[in-house]
Amino acid sequence: MIALFGEKLRFFDTTLRDGEQTPGVSLTPDQKCIIATALAAVGVDVIEAGSAAASPGDRAAIRQIANAGLGVEVCTFVRAMTGDIDAAVECGVDSVHLVVPVSDLHIQKKLRKDRATVAAMANKAVDYAKERGLIVELSGEDASRADQSFLAEVFASGVEHGADRLCFCDTVGLMTPERTALMIPPLAAIAPLSIHCHDDLGFGLATTIAALKAGASCAHVTVNGLGERAGNTPLEEVVMALERLYGYDTRIRTERLYPLSVLVSRLTGVPLPAQKPIVGELAFTHESGIHADGILKDPSTYEPLAPETVGRTRRIILGKHSGSASVEAALQESGYRPTPAQLQVIVARVKHLGDQGHRVTDGDLAAIAEAVLEVSTEPVLVLKQFTVVSGSGVLPTASVTLLVNGAEVTNAATGTGPVDAAIEALRRSVADVAAISLLEYHVDAITGGTDALVEVTATLSNGEMTRTSRGAETDIIAASVEAVVQGMNRLLRRRDEDRR
């Protein structure tokens, strides 16, 4: 199967350039450097760190990344303009992604020029960049709508002038795998060719794979598929498709893909869709009784790849679709051992809660189990009071007082907002007995109006296990505190049971 591909496939990551062009995304130089370091650790070959001509901030970021000693090729986007190339040289990059419009639509409508002028601009820019010691990747913008004969001429001439690599840009995502299989081979014969796809019609991944099969040797990608409009081809999806479907060793450290995805989502402020392949919250989550039963017997029954491969863990959640096997497994994980008759009662109550439209959390399951099994437990933590101060020009600050195993503990903390401050104060209050971190936080307004009942779902971890709990109040801070305290209690109680 590896014979489908030619030389070693390369990954050109443009998260910090094309990805940052996602509407509303703006990264600081330090944030860009953090992401670049993570990209290098994952194993991409080229990092397009930004556009040197875009702004002083982008130049500072590119310079910082170029000087970071990451051990990968650092590139910047440039137009066929000497000023752009001078800025690239000033930043100390290894290469330039020299982008030239090649479709008549772009040449005539955007540039107000003709083909001959654009071809000459490309050659002149290649000459200028090579004279300054740069690696040049000559990219045909809107190549999928270009006259392919003209595109081939531009590419061939660019290579004659010293271009090291070429790139076919499907700028608005109009390519299909069938067209790709026909159009890529003659271009790949000219020089090493990259494929750069946008995902406007959902074909980005399929077109990228088709291009690699047809002779392209490098995939342009972004983490989480970030990019303008509908985004670009996602790094994590291309890598795992090649690994899992074609048996190709990408040499990417796949176990770092999910941590990288979470990092980029956090720094860009772009949330991950729950059902996004590979990295979405639900990508390795199961509820259906039939599926969960199969997963418990053999994970490959309902999973295309092991979650650990990409740095994930499997989750089985409970709801109206759950069966006895998944409920029993969840109960056993929490330390409960019901009889068959008790299990059926618990399953019925779980389904009833799901029918009410609720997500059944670990706290819900524990409450149901303890009621059915007639278990009485004393909580490790008891909330006595909390206070939050927040407002315009005021650093959000929270103070909480808890009874921890009967001993009163008071802690204060600041945060990015009142909820963040309250959760941090709670975390500090239990720091002496456990290191607990918040993994996921979700808010829903259950009712309408200004006095709406707010439901908060929080997932916490102590490094060994996770627990999900829920709080419901008209005050979002109170609901958050309730959910976190409940989750902490579940983790601490299970830890104490394991020690016994």
Curated annotation (Swiss-Prot):
Similarity section: Belongs to the alpha-IPM synthase/homocitrate synthase family.
Single GO MF descriptor: (R)-citramalate synthase activity
Disulfide-bond pairs as recorded: none
Protein's recorded name: Putative (R)-citramalate synthase CimA
Membrane-spanning parts: none
Function: Catalyzes the condensation of pyruvate and acetyl-coenzyme A to form (R)-citramalate.
Assigned EC number: 2.3.3.21
